Structures are given as C-alpha cells and as structure tokens.
C-alpha cells in the first residue's frame, strides 16, 4: 500500500474468512505498533481485549477519518463528502485500514472512502460490525465487493451519513 511504501504506520495486514462470499471473520495486524484487531459476529478484540464503538448519533459530534481526499473522483462525490465533512467535529486525513480499527475502538466515529477493492475492505467488515458498528456502500447496500464505503460506530450516524451520500 501507499502507506507502507512511504513509511507511514497506518498500514496493516488484512485477512478475511468468507462463507458463501460473505466475510465472517476479519483480522487486521498492525505489526509496527503490535496491535491485532480480530472481528467476528458480535465481538471485536484488540490484542484479546473486547472493543466497542462509541455512541455518537449526530454528525456534529462525529470524528471522521478518510485516507485521502483524492478518493473522491467526481464533483458529485466531492460534494457529497463535503456535505458531511463540513459538519463533523473533527476530520482526520490518512489512516488507511487503521481508520476502521480506530472506529471499532471508539476513537473515531465515521470513515468515508471511495474506490476500495474487495481485499481492502472484506477483513474490516467483521471488525467494524463485531464492535457494534455499521458498514455499507454509500447507498446503504452491502459492501462485500468493495466500492464507495461508509462505516459508522453508531447506526443513527450511519443513517445520517448515507442520507447525505446517496
């Protein structure tokens, strides 16, 4: 990944176990800082300690992460992203797969990204969902094949974000 090549610490090794094409177990190993996130139905752990997302039902209270603004290729995508980014409490650039781990741990509340491949996201789905979060495509559809992704630690926040992104 770009983060690994450039020496940033936000990269990770992603492994997903699929059942009938759906991710049922996900692992993200971040060897630089010695963290391993593992997610299955109803549970996500960091080095064996259970994680939960943070309750944050409104955009104005949310901490948003995105890897890079260049993920938004069209004016419509940039406008949709900006309609959310302009309302959140904090916006953090960078993060790559680590953004989803931070969401599962309750440090950030929302991740919005674009043009992801299946191998970019499949391991992160059980990690987000196991910690209590919601993850989908921008239109609310399942994300398993990659695409334009929105993940939130709170279902109400996810619904509000999807309404802006559709």
Please identify what each model-predicted range represents:
Residues 79-83, 101-166:
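Oxyanion/phosphate-interacting regions
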Residues 1-12:
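Glycine/serine-rich anion-binding loops at beta->alpha junctions
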Residues 6, 73-77, 120-121:
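Alpha-helix N-cap/helix-start motif
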Residues 13-14, 134:
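PAS-family sensory domains
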Residues 14-100, 147-166:
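Acidic beta-strand-loop-alpha-helix segment within the catalytic core
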Residues 1, 64, 128:
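Conserved S/T- and glycine-rich ATP-binding loop of Class I adenylate-forming
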């Amino acid at each position: 990944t770009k983060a690994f090549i450039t020496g940033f610490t936000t990269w990770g090794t992603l492994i997903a176990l699929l059942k009938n094409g759906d991710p049922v177990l996900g692992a993200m190993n971040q060897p630089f800082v010695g963290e391993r996130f593992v997610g299955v139905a109803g549970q996500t752990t960091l080095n064996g300690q259970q994680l939960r997302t943070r309750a944050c039902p409104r955009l104005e209270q949310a901490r948003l992460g995105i890897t890079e603004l260049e993920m938004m290729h069209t004016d419509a995508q940039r406008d949709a992203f900006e309609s959310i980014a302009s309302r959140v409490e904090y916006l953090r650039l960078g993060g790559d797969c680590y953004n989803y781990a931070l969401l599962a741990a309750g440090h950030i509340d929302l991740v919005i990204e674009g043009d992801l491949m299946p191998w970019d996201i499949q391991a992160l789905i059980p990690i987000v969902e196991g910690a209590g979060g919601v993850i989908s495509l921008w239109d609310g559809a399942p994300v398993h094949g990659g695409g334009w992704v929105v993940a939130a630690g709170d279902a109400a926040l996810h619904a509000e974000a999807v309404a802006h992104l559709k």
